[in-house]
């Protein structure tokens, strides 16, 4: 666990609160299996706190809030039936294009004329 007496403190009280909230959520995340809705919701809440732009944080929070309102407590620990393909999640971006860079085009052999 993060030791506040050993590590460097943030510049503001708000930064300290955010850091402590993220550390708590990371510890809470370990109590859920990686393929459950609860794990995804905790990760979404961490992304809300880490957003630097107010508009982006509000958008993420509304998305999180609608997902948490539509789920029951028993669903949080159940495996997810359908995978999430949302474009903003960094955990889903790593599944596509492993080993290939997106900006590099493949070379084609051209016959001599």
From Swiss-Prot:
Bilayer-spanning residue ranges: none
Primary localization class, coarse: host cell
Keywords: Host cytoplasm, Host-virus interaction, Inhibition of host innate immune response by virus, Suppressor of RNA silencing, Viral immunoevasion
Keyword Cell division among UniProt keywords: no
Keyword Amino-acid biosynthesis annotated: no
Region (Disordered): 94-113
InterPro entries, sorted: Gemini_V2 (IPR002511), WCCH (IPR005159)
Annotated function: Through its interaction with host SGS3, acts as a suppressor of RNA-mediated gene silencing, also known as post-transcriptional gene silencing (PTGS), a mechanism of plant viral defense that limits the accumulation of viral RNAs.
Assembly information from the UniProt record: Interacts with host SGS3.
Protein name: Protein AV2
């Amino acid at each position: 666990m993060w030791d506040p007496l050993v590590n460097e403190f943030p510049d503001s009280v708000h930064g300290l609160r955010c850091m402590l909230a993220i550390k708590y959520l990371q510890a809470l995340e370990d109590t859920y299996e990686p393929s459950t809705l609860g794990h995804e919701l905790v990760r979404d809440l961490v992304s809300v706190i880490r957003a630097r732009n107010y508009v982006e944080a509000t958008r993420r929070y509304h998305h999180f809030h609608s997902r948490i309102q539509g789920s029951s407590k028993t669903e949080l620990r159940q495996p997810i039936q359908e995978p999430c393909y949302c474009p903003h999640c960094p955990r889903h971006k790593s599944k596509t294009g492993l080993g290939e860079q997106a900006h590099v085009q493949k070379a084609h052999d051209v016959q001599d004329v």
